[in-house]
C-alpha cells in the first residue's frame, strides 16, 4: 500500500515538472501580458507543488534527487508535441493537469490525511476549468 502511494507521488512529481514547463511555454506563446502573468503564476504554483511533493516523499524516506533527473518523460513530451502541432502549450498543460487530477485522486484514496495533496488538487482543478474556459473563448475545441 505504501509502495503504491510512493509510486503515485513519483508520477505526480514527473507530471508537475512537465506541467510547469508547458505553462512556461504557454507564457512565451502568449501575446497578452495578463495571460503571460497567469501562465507564469501557474508555472510557479506547479514548482511549489513539486517542492511540497518532494518534501512528502522525503518524509517517507524516499531518495528524491535520483528521481528528478529522468529525461525520458521530457523527451516523450517533446515527441508527442511534435506529433500534434495544432495543440497549443496551454492545451498540453491542461492535458497534463487532468492527468495530475487523476493521480491526486489515487494518492488521496491511499492517504486521505495528506492535506497538502487536497489543496494541490483543488487548485489544479480550478486551473483546468480556467484553462478550458480560456481555450474555448479563443476558439479551441477540446476533446475530452
What are these regions (language model features)?
Residues 25-37, 106-119, 141-144:
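Inter-helical turn/loop segments and adjacent helix faces that build the functional surface
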Residues 73, 123-124:
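Hydrophobic alpha-helical segments of small multi-pass membrane proteins
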Residues 1-6, 81-86, 138-144:
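Membrane-interacting alpha-helical segments
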Residues 36-68, 131-143:
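Conserved alpha-helical segments that form or flank metal/cofactor-binding pockets of metalloenzymes
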Residues 61-65, 115-116, 123:
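Short, highly charge-biased, low-complexity peptide segments
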Residues 1-30, 87-112, 126, 130:
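Alpha-helical bundle segments that constitute or directly flank the non-heme di-iron/ferroxidase center
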Residues 36-45, 91, 117-123:
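Short, charged, amphipathic alpha-helical segments
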Residues 55-88, 95, 99:
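Carboxylate-rich helix-loop segments that flank metal/cofactor sites and access channels
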Amino acid at each position: 500500500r505504501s509502495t503504491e502511494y510512493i509510486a503515485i507521488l513519483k508520477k505526480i512529481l514527473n507530471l508537475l515538472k512537465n506541467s510547469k514547463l508547458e505553462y512556461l511555454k504557454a507564457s512565451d506563446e502568449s501575446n497578452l501580458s495578463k495571460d503571460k502573468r497567469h501562465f507564469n503564476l501557474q508555472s510557479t504554483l506547479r514548482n511549489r507543488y513539486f517542492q511540497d511533493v518532494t518534501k512528502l516523499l522525503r518524509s517517507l524516506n524516499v531518495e528524491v534527487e535520483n528521481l528528478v533527473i529522468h529525461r525520458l518523460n521530457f523527451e516523450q513530451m517533446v515527441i508527442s508535441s511534435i506529433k500534434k502541432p495544432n495543440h497549443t502549450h496551454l492545451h498540453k498543460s491542461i492535458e497534463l493537469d487532468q492527468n495530475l487530477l487523476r493521480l491526486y485522486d489515487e494518492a488521496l484514496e491511499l492517504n486521505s490525511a495528506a492535506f497538502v495533496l487536497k489543496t494541490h488538487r483543488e487548485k489544479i482543478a480550478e486551473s483546468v476549468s480556467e484553462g478550458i474556459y480560456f481555450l474555448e473563448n479563443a476558439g479551441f475545441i477540446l476533446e475530452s
